[in-house]
Amino acid sequence: MADTARGIQRLYLTLTLLTTLAASFIWGVNTLFLLDAGLDNTQAFAANAFFTLGMVIFEVPTGVVADTRGRRFSFLLGTVSLLLSTVAYWWMWLSRAPFWGWAVVSVLIGLGFTFFSGATEAWVVDALAASGFSGNLETLFG
């Protein structure tokens, strides 16, 4: 059982690392993308702040969705949210949309990311419980 729990923890940490790495690559060029879309420096950084605000606002509610409606449903909502908000991002870039549009879509992208984190955390808690893990989850979630 201890090997199973360690494997689950490793998989969770790997998924978290890969998700963080992918987001880092995206956000590494996002400011340049926003500047190319016609926003000034202040607006571009504010749009990025709205993304963070979206993540802060929606982290707990989307975790509840994963716990009550299921991880698969939460992943589906995250996928749909990110697909629609990414299409909106692209359309806004094409149309040189005003700042308020970028702020709204940035919040929605934050929403999409939180659906994934809530589902992943719900999965690891359930998987560890099923494996008989009796340790402290604080060591995993920090």
Where do the protein language model's features map onto the residues?
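Cytoplasmic membrane-interface "Motif A"-like loop-to-helix N-cap segments
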Residues: 68-79, 133
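C-terminal ends and interior cores of transmembrane alpha-helices
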Residues: 76, 80-97, 102
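Helix-loop boundary and gating motifs at the non-cytosolic
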Residues: 2-57
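Cytoplasmic helix-loop-helix junction between adjacent transmembrane helices
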Residues: 107-142
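Helix-to-loop junctions at the C-terminal end of transmembrane segments
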Residues: 58-71
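Hydrophobic alpha-helix/TM-entry signal in multi-pass membrane transporters
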Residues: 8-16, 75, 102, 140-141
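Helical-face signature of the major facilitator-like transporter fold
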Residues: 15-16, 20, 52, 99-110
